[in-house]
Amino acid sequence: MTLNGEAADSGDAGAPVPVALPLVGRISEDRDIDDIAGVFSTQLADDIEAATGLRWDIASDVMVAGLPAPNAATAHPVPSHASCWKSFITLRLDPSSLEPQEYRLTIARSGIDVVGGDTEGVRNGVQTLRQIIRQCAPALPRLVIADKPAYKVRGYYLDATRGRVPTLDWLKTWADRLCLYKYNQLQLYIEHTFMFDDLSETWRGTSPLKPADIIAFDEYCARLGIELVPSVSTFGHQYMAMRTRELRHLGEFPEDADRRYGFVERQRHHTLNITEPESLAFSFKLIDAYMQLFRTRKFNICGDETFDLGRGRSKPEAERRGVAAMYADFVSQLCRHLSERGREPMFWGDIAVEMPQILGLLPDNVTLLNWLYAPGIGEDKVRLVAQAGAPQYVCSAVWCWNALLPRLDDSWNNISRLARYGVKYGAVGYLVTDWGDYGHVNDLRMAVSGMIFGAQCAWNPMAHIQGEAGCGDGEGGSADGYADAAADAVRENKAAADGDSPAPLPSSSEGDDYTGGAADAIAGAPAGGDGSCAEMCRRVAEVEYGDRSGGIVEALRDAACRVAFGWDDMVWYCELDEGDGRMNRDAASAMHLGVHGFSGEYGREWEARLLGSTDLDEARRTMLQGLSPHIVRAAEANEALLCDAMRLGAAAGRASRLGAARRDVPAMLAAIEGQRWFNLVGLCLARRHDVITVDAGDIARASAGLIEPDAGSSAGPEAVQDVSIRVARGLERWFETYCDLWRSVSAESELARIASIVWRCADALRS
């Protein structure tokens, strides 16, 4: 990668005269570019209009090499290309001098030239130019950029099944954003939320996607240069199917099919009994139907987290053959089925990595998706797969699941580390995952920053930030260093403040409940000690929202560290109840305090106490006692969250790209206020179970303005009950706003399951 500014025609040394976009301009696109719909030219015209109010003309052209071009960029005049149209921006191909996906962008006073080694290279160059236009128009810096990605496959993985089904309109909007940040693959994850024929008992009431939705979205993605890849659970994660009357006999534990629905159990008990002959036919049916809707040859069969394999109906077979052999045999059959139909199978690699003997039993043409989500992840498992000779994507996470607010430090640390390891060990792709466990309570817009982190690191994982060797600066293809440096060249006195903020409080989800890893730092302490995360947040805020202060994303980052009682805690509290007043021991065994940043010794002690509880009331009290070091800080957390909301709102009001800010900021503010209510719920529940001693006045003050203190006495159980009821009412009012925001980007889906948790907590406060 090179970034070279031209010498200035006038002015002080080191301060080149910027290039002014003309009042009347044209964008010309070489007809050899595979962009029949003119998407790239239209993207540029749209961004120029948004930045300047001027609508440029668009022309298609046939470039002729070897002749002087009317707008030849003087900084890179050879080879020149003649055009039939006088255009200020030219898009063209030059496969003789540039590699596939590589591009060269020249901004000169005589015009702008975007050249690609292939169509995707042109697309990549156009996206860099768009980012510069968004930050600098109408005056752009003079420069030449030549660049290509570290990873040829830069994918995003979107959960559309664990409670939330995005609308087709929102999916298209998200694909637009992925294109801007140079992603070229999107995997859409389905368990039960697709309208498969003859499986209506599985998908009923979930607002399932239809075949026409997939066909339309596949076409839309293809026009943007994004490969839409099907991803369907075909082994594990069949919780909803295994609860139906028609299909329960295919599960490891069909006798449990009528247990009360639970977010916790949904993540644990969902594995097919592969000794049942119909199971393979069931998986084949899903594959055969779904793959027909996509133009890609790739297919992700998933195959992850098969926790119950060999524990239920298949236990005798496991005792005879071993779980590893059973797993490898079933996955191999699925992969061969796809290969015989001209498809390229891929699968999640967690089981194979934990049982490495599986790696030698799988077909050679299978791509392993090596998901490793711990913020402090090491390179061992990436090296293991590389040494086994298996092609792999390394897969990181945006860290939004199970919470209202995104854990941006965890996301950045995980994404940046893993991108380096993948390059080191020759990974063939980089995939950023966006999960929605526990009902997908996380608003889809909370993933924007993590998505951009991933785009940056997939493009240039070895770049530097603030002089610190690390992963992911903006000199690649996301929160682009090009665009950032361009903005610096045009705005000499640009503000770059992170701003002072209160010390962060414990996060509700530090650590990694997927791998058992731990965060780099004590809960609540920003993990990016070298300042790289803060700098990336600032750059994301500027390129995405036009927020030069960085305050929008930085406030969101800080808010995630103010969790005294989180969504996962509310789910745990409710689902400790079997549904009939008895303690749910299976749910209790899934609760790990390590994901809250507590030390291993402390977490193990309280987890053992929880499992030793004899009834529901004792279990809930024990859970709250274990979490009490966080819960008692609710007042401090809510005061800080109020400050975060004000900082975020003020920064959004000053943002130059108000349209983009208005699209996301309401969801951010709602998440912050929701967390304030959740913190109060934890405080009231802890008081109700005699875990802490607070009076009504303490609770009202802890609300930081959400509840006015009562003029009467705040002592006594009646006053505490009254303020708890007011918390319940406030929580329910907030939830109606949350529902409105949900419906703005998602179908109704399984919103009622989230409502059930919210209302059960509200009812507990009233009891």
PLM features: residue spans?
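Substrate-binding cleft of carbohydrate-active enzyme catalytic domains
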Residues: 152-349, 359-361, 367-369, 378, ...
